[in-house]
Each structure stands twice: as structure tokens, then as C-alpha cells.
């Protein structure tokens, strides 16, 4: 059922790579907005532990599901689970990502196997999820897709980085391109697609010296995930402000 405003009476969100870090905080903030949230992790035990941790903090409405976005079989399986349990998906946050570039590697001497592995998760994983769930969103004439990108994927950064983090930077630049293409394709469907740079956040990936908390890093993804009908689409954001690609 749909409210007159166009919002679903009870929204359902899925956040990839969300048993820890920014993804975990995104799940928490969405659930606190009374949204049913699917917390996903590659390991079911890790996901279940994360849900128990949220429950201890009084955060409910969170369901754990196992997901490996680098596997089409796994993506097909979770699509089936979501359709069976909820019948729809309103919000997709593509948060899962890996950073496996070595610090001394540049574009000219990159290990292409590392590039392939990184693209498989950071780009193709998000693409698989979009392909799987966009039909559900279009059927309900409602969807919000948030691609968690990085400043490392922005052209201005790459022009001054000296070729560092080549696999990761390329994967995030490609994710930005996917964001633009999907937003263009889905205009007029009420499925909004945006990218976001969460900044340098204190997580396992960002390290303890990072300047931002997970709460700060999750704020803009959650804002984009809950945009009203007619909201912006096809843009890149940092702290709720549009930034260049």
C-alpha cells in the first residue's frame, strides 16, 4: 500500500557490507527511522552478531542476510529471499567495498589481478545488486539507490595523486559512471540514484587516524536514502552538498 504522498507505509532497505564500519552505522540510522533494514555480510555469523549488537542498543527492525556481491548466485539468492520476505525493496545502499592496493603501487606498475578483484567487488558487485533490485523498485514506482563511492574516484584527486591506489580509484570512478548512467536511464520512474563520498572515516579500512566518525560518514548516505519524491538524482555528494566527479 502507498500513502498519498507517494511514500510506502513501511519501507524496506538493504545495505551491503553492513556488519561493521560505515555500513553498520547506516543500518542503525535507517532502522532508527523505523525502516525495515536488511543487514548483509559475507559471513552469516558476523551478520547475526551485528544484529544482536544493535538489539542490545535498542535498535530493532533489522534482519541479517548472507550476501557475497561478487557472486551472482549469492545475489540471486538474496533477491529471492527479499521477494519472499518483503515483496519489494525501497532502498539499496551499495556500501560493500575492498581496498587491496599496496601503498607503493601506481597505475604504471599495478598488478592487474588486483585490479580485476577490486572491480569485481567495488563495481560489478554494486552493478549486480542494481540489476537485481531495480525491477522491484520500478514495479513500486519508488526507489532510492545510494552508491558509496570515494574521493579517490574523483578526477581531481586522480589528477594529483601520482597514480596511487590505482585499482581502488578506478573502481570508484567507474561506480560514479554507473551512477550517472542509471540515473539517466531511470528518470521519470521515481527511482533516484546518487553517489556519496563519506570522507576519511575511522573504520577498519580508514584506520584509527581518520578524521571522521562513522556517524559523520553515514549521515549523507542516510540522507540520500531517504530523499523525498522529486529529489535530486545522478549526482555525487559530500556532507549533503553536491561535489564534482
Residue ranges and their predicted role:
Residues 2-38:
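Canonical Rossmann dinucleotide-binding motif of NAD(H)/NADP(H)-dependent dehydrogenases/reductases
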Residues 33-49:
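Conserved glycine-rich Rossmann-like NAD(P)H-binding loop of the short-chain dehydrogenase/reductase
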Residues 44, 66-77:
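The beta1-alpha1 cofactor-binding region of Rossmann-like NAD(H)/NADP(H)-dependent oxidoreductases
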Residues 59-60, 81-94, 100, 111:
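A glycine-rich helix->loop->beta "capping" turn
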Residues 93, 129-133, 137, 178-179, ...:
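Hydrophobic positions on the long internal alpha-helix
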Residues 98-102, 106-119, 138-187:
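Catalytic loop of short-chain dehydrogenase/reductase
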Residues 173, 188, 195-196, 207-245:
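C-terminal helical subdomain
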Amino acid at each position: 500500500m502507498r500513502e498519498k504522498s507517494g511514500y510506502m507505509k513501511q519501507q524496506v532497505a538493504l545495505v551491503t557490507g553492513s556488519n561493521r564500519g560505515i555500513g553498520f552505522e547506516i543500518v542503525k540510522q535507517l532502522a532508527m527511522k523505523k525502516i525495515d533494514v536488511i543487514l548483509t555480510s559475507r559471513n552469516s555469523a558476523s551478520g547475526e552478531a551485528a544484529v544482536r549488537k544493535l538489539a542490545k542498543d535498542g535498535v530493532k527492525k533489522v534482519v541479517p542476510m548472507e550476501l557475497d556481491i561478487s557472486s551472482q548466485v549469492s545475489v540471486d539468492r538474496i533477491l529471492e529471499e527479499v521477494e519472499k520476505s518483503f515483496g519489494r525493496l525501497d532502498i539499496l545502499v551499495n556500501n560493500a567495498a575492498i581496498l587491496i592496493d599496496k601503498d607503493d603501487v601506481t597505475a604504471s606498475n599495478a598488478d592487474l589481478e588486483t585490479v580485476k578483484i577490486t572491480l569485481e567487488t567495488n563495481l560489478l558487485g554494486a552493478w549486480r545488486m542494481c540489476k537485481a533490485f531495480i525491477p522491484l523498485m520500478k514495479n513500486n514506482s519508488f526507489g532510492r539507490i545510494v552508491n558509496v563511492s570515494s574521493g579517490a574516484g574523483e578526477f581531481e584527486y586522480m589528477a594529483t595523486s601520482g597514480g596511487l591506489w590505482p585499482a581502488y580509484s578506478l573502481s570508484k570512478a567507474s561506480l560514479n559512471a554507473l551512477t550517472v548512467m542509471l540515473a539517466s536511464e531511470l528518470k521519470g520512474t521515481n527511482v533516484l540514484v546518487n553517489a556519496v563520498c563519506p570522507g576519511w572515516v575511522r573504520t577498519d579500512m580508514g584506520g584509527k587516524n581518520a578524521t571522521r566518525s562513522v556517524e559523520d560518514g553515514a549521515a549523507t548516505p542516510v540522507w540520500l536514502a531517504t530523499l523525498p519524491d522529486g529529489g535530486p538524482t545522478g549526482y555525487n555528494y559530500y556532507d549533503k552538498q553536491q561535489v564534482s566527479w
